[in-house]
Amino acid sequence: MSGTGQQSVVCTIGTKVAWDDLKVFFFTLNLFNNSPPTVYLLCDTETKSRIEKDKENIYKGTLNIQDTLESYASMNRQIMERTKGKRYKTLWEDFMMEKATVLEWAFKDGAKSAFFFDSDITFFSTLPEVPANVKLALSPHFIKPVDELRYGHYNAGFVWTADPTMPEKWRSAAERSRYYDQAALEELRFNEPTTYEFPVQVNYGWWRMFQGTESPDVLKSKWTIFRNEQIPSVGLRIEGKPLNSVHTHWGEKRDPVTKTFNLWLLQQIQKISNHPKAASFARFIVREFKLQ
């Protein structure tokens, strides 16, 4: 593999509703990158103000911000799903496709390639590498086929592209999608023969553990501790390879599956108390979210 992914810029979106997620997002980008990547963020005015007041402590890399998401700022997903959209059926679908907007901004600003990450991504290493000569990289859910039929084969919160026309292709595909921006990625994959799929160690979400084709206990058994990685890591491996990133809301208080996943993962990390980055991350999560 080349270092293509690690040379890419990072794009994300988030309003004040996602502030807890953004704190973890930036903290872990700082923790596992000696030179944190350039980030493009679309947000609301409150989020922009909070970041600008404490930028040096929030993010060490270059951070470009546009507060163009004010119309979504006071609403959660449930409200947006009940609100009529402008381009799409619901406002939630409009909001999801702001992912394409932030990618377009990065390309217009001169980026050669870009990741889009949901703001609830937690990084446990440097950005994943992407093979040379690839234009699109996607993250499979690795869930049961029956769930894929509903939610899509790929997760829309972890996408890489080197194609400046991809954002508009994504918007167009979303108009025909059975599940928002997410199942739309299958159309992009069908039309892009060079697509790369990220492995299971990348973008690991609760759904991968609890909606997988194997039982949660079997999937947990594939996780191991390995303290002496030669790359920046949190000291955990899946199927013998370093854990790169997870996809979760650390501040979730109501959903029992997310809470179970978070507590289990934190417990694995706390077992590695002599691993500096693992210890730093665990302290941060316990302090911010009172998890034990």
Label for each model-derived stretch:
Residues 20-23, 97-101, 179-187:
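A structural signal for well-ordered alpha-helical segments within the folded catalytic domains
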Residues 94-148:
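GT-A fold catalytic core of metal-dependent nucleotide-sugar glycosyltransferases
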Residues 161-261:
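Catalytic core and acceptor-binding pocket of nucleotide-sugar-dependent glycosyltransferases
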Residues 64-91, 210-232:
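Charged, glycine/proline-rich intrinsically disordered loops and linkers
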Residues 16-18, 46-48, 121-123, 142-145, ...:
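Short, solvent-exposed loop/turn segments at secondary-structure junctions
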Residues 1-82, 108-111, 265, 273-292:
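N-terminal anchoring/stem segment of glycosyltransferases
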Residues 124-188:
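Conserved catalytic core of nucleotide-sugar-dependent glycosyltransferases
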Residues 22-23, 27, 68-78, 145-154, ...:
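Short, charged, surface-exposed secondary-structure boundary motifs
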